[in-house]
Amino acid sequence: MFDFEYQLKIIPEKPGVYLMKNSLGEVIYVGKAKVLKNRVRQYFQNSKNHGSKVRAMVKNIAEFEYIITDSEMEALILECNLIKKYRPRYNILLKDDKHYPFLKITTNEDFPRIFVTRVRAKDGARYLGPYPETSAVYETIELIKKIFPLRTCRLNIKENGEPVKPCLNYHIKLCTAPCAGYISREEYGKTIKKIIDLLNGKDNEVINDLKIKMEKASSELKFEEAASFRDKLLAVEKIRERQKIISSNFENEDFINMYSEEIDLCAQIFFVRDGKIMGREHFILDRSIFGNNADIISNFIKDFYGGTAFIPKTIYVPEVMDIELLENWLSSKKGSKVSIKIPQKGEKKKILDLVESNAKNTLEQFKLKLKVDKELYSNTLKELQNILELEEIPNRIEAYDISNIQGVDSVGSMIVFDKGKPKNSDYRRFKIKTVKGANDYDSMREILTRRFTHGLEEIKEIQKRNLLLSGAKFSVFPDLILMDGGKGQVNIALEVLEKLNINIPVCGMVKDDKHKTRGLVYNNKEINIKSNNKIMQFITRVQDEVHRFAITYHRSLRNRRVLHSVLEDIPNIGEKRRKELLQKFGSVENIKKASYDELLDTNSINQKAAKSIIDYFNNAK
């Protein structure tokens, strides 16, 4: 039994990190402290001053442990790492690590390419961004392709390299074919410079050049050509619209503010890159486990920048705790000075007010949608309960499906709807192991047996404390099982559950002549439901989702089997090396033609691997 009184007495008066655990041994909260003794003792004293969430957390604490560090900065870094590792329930948790996309221009190549990447490497290439809106990045690339002819292939093209036959893009004027030697490195480089200038807001030269060409084509009665230049001008205008300048200092800055109502809070962040608002992001949080606004923003900064690939030069906030400590931590992560500022007036204060206004609007919309969705899903599930005469509302529904093509690569899928909404984290996939050929009944029997056997085993392990609840994949059972098939599949499910001594209601779908669901079968009774009924719409949604999930998995298995690369047969060439070779040379044929020195020029290829490649292709001749 954990002795709280004794443990609180012996905590050292040093900086460090503390971990709160529940009765299952799960880490439910991670915190840092300048003085561990003072901070940890606060949780178990003056509970009236705590928020409701803190009181709930303290009730769940069965034990705690701590790690002493040499400094508060060390404690902050360790706290961030442990929060990432354990994802504790009572910490502010944003989405998974945010790796926003960059536009990468491979200026380290003779003939650069432009594409989207989420990894910023020190490889000599030019990176623009990051951009918070992924769709906007891809749209920007498409617009650039309309304006400038660029190569999109992965060939390793050198200025005086051996020419190859140009691809279709050259013939439809989307590429200038540097692979065939049709353009010099210098001329191609001028195009790249124009692209970089355009993306940096220096678009006057590009616009003037296009206008001159359009007017010239028009005066020569080349109307199609003139229309092409007009379309390019419109594309430039679209790129320009995405880059509204709101600051004259052309620096990278983030603006963070929030708005809260009772326990609900929306934190909003505006991203300013080179003086232009490039996007925004919001996070809906529960503020009740933290203190004042300054404490919340401090935790938000640690959470957000602990998981993002880019940190701006300046971050503006309305208030914050531990400002000097956070600045030092961010500066060490970035490798250069980062400032956190609290503007009281002027342009920066106006932007912060704008961020708060957006946060308020976002929170109001979120709460309204939540209310509408909750009522809709709750009413639908209650109606489903009444139609099937279930004892409980089916808050958790599991649906199953089998997918195969002519008996090959049979797979089973399980999806979960929790309180009317898909719960993707609980989706599971099963590769059929014991059934040969296309036998949906036996395949369904196999996956249901595996699913519920695993569940029973996990429950035993959790009870023995050999397994944490968070580490279990099958221990939560559904309130209702929904089978895509009719009576046959329902009977298979009931047979499996009976053998395992599990009591869960099972219903199936009744199809019409066109294979469309027209109702449900439950307890050997068919229940017809009108197509415009909310229940039928919900069932159709579940059915579509389980089909989508099953087919996606089946397709991935099939592709993995069909797309077997010859590189997989070469000794000393693993997945990482295969990937890098294909990125560098573009195709197996080009790898086959590569010289020993060219192979060695690939990052992960050493002398032994290069020799294996040469020997393999020589022996294959």
From Swiss-Prot:
One of its GO terms (biological process) is SOS response. Pfam families: GIY-YIG, HHH_2, UVR, UvrC_RNaseH, UvrC_RNaseH_dom. Signal peptide: none annotated. It is found in: Cytoplasm. Keywords: Cytoplasm, DNA damage, DNA excision, DNA repair, Excision nuclease, SOS response. GO terms for molecular function: DNA binding; excinuclease ABC activity. Transmembrane segments: none annotated. Residues 13-92 form the GIY-YIG domain. One of its GO terms (cellular component) is excinuclease repair complex. Its main location: cytoplasm. Residues 204-239 form the UVR domain. HAMAP family: UvrC (MF_00203). Interacts with UvrB in an incision complex. Belongs to the UvrC family. The UvrABC repair system catalyzes the recognition and processing of DNA lesions. UvrC both incises the 5' and 3' sides of the lesion. The N-terminal half is responsible for the 3' incision and the C-terminal half is responsible for the 5' incision. This is UvrABC system protein C. The lineage of its organism: Bacteria, Bacillati, Bacillota, Clostridia, Eubacteriales. The gene is uvrC.
